[in-house]
């Protein structure tokens, strides 16, 4: 299968290191292409791999990276319970954003080991899901310019920062779906103490038209920052039949 993800951050104003606007705007865009292959091993288990060329264009800077996702999936015979384990972003930059000491500055992609579980009700079009991400490291806090967050996050807060909860509405025909998710880490990091926002929440949906799958998602990072995502994917093998 082939997938395409395009993320446009929109027009952003130029500013100095103190946040003072200096005039003019610039754009930032990311393009991710997925080349996916999956193989069924028995009736309830499958494995898959996805190769991901990543192109980034930020103002006058650009980067090219190559990543790979590897995963396995199990479901019960009645398909009500699904379990998945995935290692994401195995790869590195082929071209960095800038030069350092006369050489390209290249970085590894942010590795992410994830475990997912979801359960679909038998007599209602509802599916509940939970994803536990970044299993390879416990401490997801980071220092800022004004304070060091290391050690200040309670253990139960850190535990929930590793989790993403979701609720899907999927009719029996499965020709479309709606989904709502909550990411506690995103809310903890992006929510401002004196402002209300939907940071951490995301709403999306999708539709299947012939052999194409179209998806759309909306999320709010801060009170004035919104992210709109659209995706298009199709199965090459089914298209050739």
Residue positions per predicted region:
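Subset of outer-membrane beta-barrel
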Residues: 1-241
């Amino acid at each position: 299968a082939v997938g395409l993800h395009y993320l446009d951050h929109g027009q952003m104003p130029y500013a100095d290191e103190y946040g003072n606007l200096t005039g003019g705007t610039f754009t930032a865009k990311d393009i991710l292409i997925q080349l996916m292959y999956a193989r069924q091993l028995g009736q309830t288990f499958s494995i898959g791999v996805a190769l991901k060329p990543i192109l980034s264009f930020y103002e006058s800077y650009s980067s090219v990276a190559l990543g790979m996702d590897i995963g396995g999936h199990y479901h019960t015979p009645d398909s009500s319970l699904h379990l998945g384990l995935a290692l994401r972003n195995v790869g590195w930059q082929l071209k960095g954003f800038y030069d350092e000491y006369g050489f390209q500055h290249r970085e590894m992609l942010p590795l992410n080991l994830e475990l997912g579980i979801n359960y679909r009700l038998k007599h209602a079009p509802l599916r509940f899901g939970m994803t536990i991400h970044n299993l390879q490291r416990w401490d997801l806090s980071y220092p800022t310019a004004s304070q060091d967050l290391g050690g200040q996050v309670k253990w139960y807060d850190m535990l929930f920062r590793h989790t993403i909860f979701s609720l899907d509405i999927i009719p029996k025909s499965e020709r479309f779906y709606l989904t709502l998710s909550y990411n506690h880490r995103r809310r903890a990091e992006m929510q401002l103490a004196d402002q209300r926002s939907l940071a951490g929440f995301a709403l999306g949906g999708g539709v299947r038209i012939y052999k194409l799958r179209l998806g759309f998602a909306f999320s709010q990072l801060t009170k004035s920052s919104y992210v709109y995502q659209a995706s298009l994917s199709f199965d090459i093998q089914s298209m050739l039949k």
